[in-house]
Amino acid sequence: MALLHIPLNQIEEQHILELIATRAPETNIIEYKRETYGHSLRDDLEFLADVSSLANTSGGDLIIGFAATQGIPEETVPFTGDFDAEINRLEGRARAGLQPRISLESRAVAVQGGHILILRVARSYNPPHRIIRENSNRFWARSTAGKYEPNVDQLRELFTLAPRIADQTREFRTTRLIRIASGDAPVTLMHKDVLVLHVVPFSAFDRDAPLPMAELERDYMSFHPIGSRQSQALKINFDGFLAMSNGDRAANVERAYVQLFRGGIVEAVDGLYARASGEPLIPVVQVERNIAGHAMRLMRDLAAIGIEPPYAVLASLLTAEKARFNFAHPGDGAWYDRMGSYTDRPQYAFGEVIFDSAPANVQGCAQRMRPLLDQLAQSGGMAESVSFRSDGTFVTGR
């Protein structure tokens, strides 16, 4: 038994006591410490080795305040000092002593006699993390037997993880675009010319994430299609979970859909063109708002069902019919003065943007995605996105 399946902010004393009652042993994802770490250089190096070994392998919980014999917890030895100050001290040590930095969360769980400190280390998708304290330059990994220093071959494997994930993400996008363009989407689309948005958790290629199907099939607000306030129809399918924009099942066509794959990857597709005097137009400003706003919502929806960051966000346009980019803001009466160039290819696949955490708001999301949005504008002949003011603020509406 471990605690990783329980959100850190929901862990209570009963969960702590269950570890003792079930004699849950130390593994590659859980380590017990009787006392917190001291203040000497040796103590710092031990702490950094412990947390970096978790980050470089599978992630896990470092639990301070357990007396254990041969890795089996026997009793709690609660921390009785200022737990906020101690957590801040340890988090500061991790920030200053490792490169690159790791993702670390902490919680003090109240128990009889004091607190148990839990440091939750996320599995890193940018390994390996090395100890830079006093120029140590050492790497650590972890197995069921404890932490160890990886050999050359193991280090090489760690160094290639991030590029491998990038390649898998791009390959997934390419495969999906081919299928959608050929008519092999999970629904029959109303239009062939579409915006395709992918949100790819880095964990997606490790394992299939267990999706909460029973909850999803009752939730019309999460993972809803672009351009809709909520889903109009929901369906469990072979690939995972499908949300659709059309509530009329007899119509059998969809303007937009969201496919949540079992690994946690999300694909959101929406009709792209607007038409004026019969000419198909790409309303760039509205497309940019759709990308930023929906990417933010999808990342937050993923986090809510336990599929954690980092996430790669990718946006693409499928433009089977020749169209013209238009840079008018919604409601701008002089839209015909805001024309850009014509499309010159059937597909635009813009560069991915990496998020280490789900953005708190559309502003933060759009600013992070500025390079992608600029690339979209440049595809239509504009030097940069027209959705940002001179101070960098993203224009969300008028």
Segments (PLM) and residue ranges:
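Divalent-cation
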Residues: L4-I11, E74-E134
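Sequence-level motif detector for i,i+2 pairs with an aromatic at +2
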Residues: P25-T27, R101, G114-I116, S136, ...
